[in-house]
């Protein structure tokens, strides 16, 4: 296959917050224009995180590259114009505006490996480290300060050393029961 007819990875800049919508629009434009052979995967590298708002657990999406979409495609004049005419696409990153350059296979491998490592299990948005100061905001130890001793991300629990009457007391708490100082 001729080098210019090989699919390569390109980075698109899109309106921030609209990355997923842009990726979906690209797929629809490709299908409508019957250009499936020129396009491969369109992705917005992200992971699901759990954050706690108002005492409630919520899943949200954390984008690795906010405002950017990765696209595997063969770059021709017609594919370039198709992408440039998708709403909320600001342009390609790298190279010249009319002749974008692809990102290296090494960079793509790093991104894809990172996505594989994450898997499907959402991680907590707030990460705790042993030795870190926290404040208990719920339960019998509410309003006490403590030091993180151990972190169990599988069960979303912490072992915290809370100072009660001048003595350090080990307590096991849920992520939802604490906040960072």
Swiss-Prot record:
Subunit structure: Monomer. Interacts with the transcription termination factor Rho and with RNA polymerase.
Name recorded for this polypeptide: Transcription termination/antitermination protein NusG
Ribosomal protein as UniProt keyword: no
Role according to the record: Participates in transcription elongation, termination and antitermination. In the absence of Rho, increases the rate of transcription elongation by the RNA polymerase (RNAP), probably by partially suppressing pausing. In the presence of Rho, modulates most Rho-dependent termination events by interacting with the RNAP to render the complex more susceptible to the termination activity of Rho. May be required to overcome a kinetic limitation of Rho to function at certain terminators. Also involved in ribosomal RNA transcriptional antitermination.
S-S pairs: none
Family under the similarity heading: Belongs to the NusG family.
Domain KOW residues, every copy: 130-161
UniProt entry tagged with the keyword Transcription: yes
Keywords, sorted A to Z: Transcription, Transcription antitermination, Transcription regulation, Transcription termination
One GO biological process term: DNA-templated transcription termination
GO cellular component: cytosol
């Amino acid at each position: 296959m001729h080098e210019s007819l090989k699919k390569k990875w390109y980075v698109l800049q899109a309106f921030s917050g609209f990355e997923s919508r842009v990726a979906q629009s690209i797929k629809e434009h490709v299908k409508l224009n019957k250009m499936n052979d020129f396009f491969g995967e369109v992705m917005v590298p992200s992971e699901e995180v759990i954050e706690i708002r108002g005492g409630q657990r919520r899943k949200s999406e954390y984008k690795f590259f906010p405002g950017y979409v990765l696209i595997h495609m063969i770059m021709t004049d017609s594919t370039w114009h198709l992408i440039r005419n998708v709403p909320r696409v600001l342009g390609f990153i790298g190279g010249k505006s009319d002749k974008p350059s692809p990102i290296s296979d090494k960079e793509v491998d790093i991104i894809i490996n990172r996505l594989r490592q994450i898997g499907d299990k959402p991680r907590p948005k707030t990460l705790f480290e042993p030795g870190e100061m926290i404040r208990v905001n719920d339960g019998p130890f509410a309003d006490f300060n403590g030091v993180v001793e151990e972190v169990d991300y599988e069960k979303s629990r912490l072992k915290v050393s809370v100072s009660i009457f001048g003595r350090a007391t080990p307590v096991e708490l849920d992520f939802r029961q604490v906040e960072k100082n």
